[in-house]
């Protein structure tokens, strides 16, 4: 009888100490002892904002303005503007022959006046950093970015960090949220933004830290704002976001100024650094997908934590 009681007690103890597996596959983080320091008594939402801001400061405080005039420009950077190859001289355009002289029917002529697909031309005075330049191409930037990759078990070299195939914006957010204390019941890390966006959309976690709200919306500090990229730049239906397959970009909101209609958000791999984006809101005074074509916002991941 006593032996049976001991066996039952051991079984119960084993059940209590068993670590449950996450609800979806998640890369195992590399060993890491870094513990960012935040204000005593800070709430989880406040810790997210504080840690994101600390990282932005470590990267030198780069600022990017997303203007109501549909521009996206670096307004401050700790590194000088990149030395880019000079543009090739323009070749004088030959006077086109008339359709009759060219021996082509007039109806067959092609309109080649615009090849910009309706996008505004680049502004010559607008500072930007192509891949392989900016803070991520410095020894400090490389060492900082590699920390973020460790949260998903990767250890890329400095050359990889500067390549587009190793875009690190999603692992930056994953790193910040995990360091802020969110556990696997609240948030799962991912190499792609669409992984944790789909988690929040589908409500798969036991104690989700976020839920999805489509734009237009007014975000709050601690929320995460996301836009489609590439082929899904103007995605309209959140239901179409595929897990790990839809290209996206997301930033952590750290400040909102309704009076000036500006949202401040910090993101990784923005102009090759951790940058603060000063997002100028449109006439509605809310975040939307039409005010700036460089970042057509799609959704807000609402932070449900204190």
Where is each model-derived feature located?
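N-terminal capping segments
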Residues: 24-185
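Low-complexity, Gly/Ser/Thr/Pro-rich intrinsically disordered linker/tail segments
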Residues: 269-306
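C-terminal motif of bacterial Sec signal peptides marking the signal peptidase cleavage site
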Residues: 13-15
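...with weaker cross-activation on analogous glycine-rich loops/strands in unrelated enzymes
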Residues: 188-271
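Short, solvent-exposed loop/turn and secondary-structure capping segments
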Residues: 64-65, 187-189, 237-238, 276-278
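Bacterial signal peptide processing site
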Residues: 17-19
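Bacterial N-terminal signal peptides that target proteins for export
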Residues: 1-6
């Amino acid at each position: 009888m006593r032996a049976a009681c001991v066996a039952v007690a051991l079984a119960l103890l084993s059940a209590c100490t068993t670590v449950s597996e996450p609800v979806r596959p998640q890369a195992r983080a590399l060993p890491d002892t870094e513990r960012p320091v935040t204000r005593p008594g800070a709430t989880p939402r406040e810790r997210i904002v504080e840690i994101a801001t600390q990282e932005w400061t470590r990267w030198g405080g780069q600022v990017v303005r997303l203007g109501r005039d549909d521009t996206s420009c670096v307004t401050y950077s700790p590194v000088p503007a990149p030395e880019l190859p000079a543009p090739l001289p323009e070749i004088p355009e030959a006077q086109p022959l008339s359709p009759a002289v060219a021996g082509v029917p007039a109806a067959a002529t092609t309109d080649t006046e615009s090849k910009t697909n309706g996008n505004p031309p680049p502004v010559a005075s607008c500072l930007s950093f192509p891949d392989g330049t900016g803070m991520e191409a410095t020894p400090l930037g490389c060492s900082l970015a590699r920390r973020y990759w460790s949260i998903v078990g990767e250890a890329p070299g400095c050359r990889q960090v500067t390549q587009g195939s190793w875009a690190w914006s999603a692992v930056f957010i994953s790193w910040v949220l995990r360091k802020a204390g969110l556990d696997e019941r609240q948030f799962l890390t991912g190499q792609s933004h669409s992984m944790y966006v789909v988690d929040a959309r589908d409500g798969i976690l036991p104690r989700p830290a976020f839920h999805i709200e489509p734009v237009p919306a007014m975000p709050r500090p601690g929320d995460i704002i996301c836009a489609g990229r590439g082929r899904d730049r103007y995605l309209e239906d959140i239901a179409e976001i595929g897990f790990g397959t839809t290209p996206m970009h997301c930033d952590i909101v750290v400040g909102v100024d309704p009076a000036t209609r500006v949202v401040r958000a910090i993101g990784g791999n923005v102009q090759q650094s951790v940058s603060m984006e000063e997002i100028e809101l449109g006439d509605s005074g809310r975040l939307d997908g039409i005010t700036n074509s460089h970042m057509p916002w799609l959704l807000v991941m609402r932070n449900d934590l204190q």
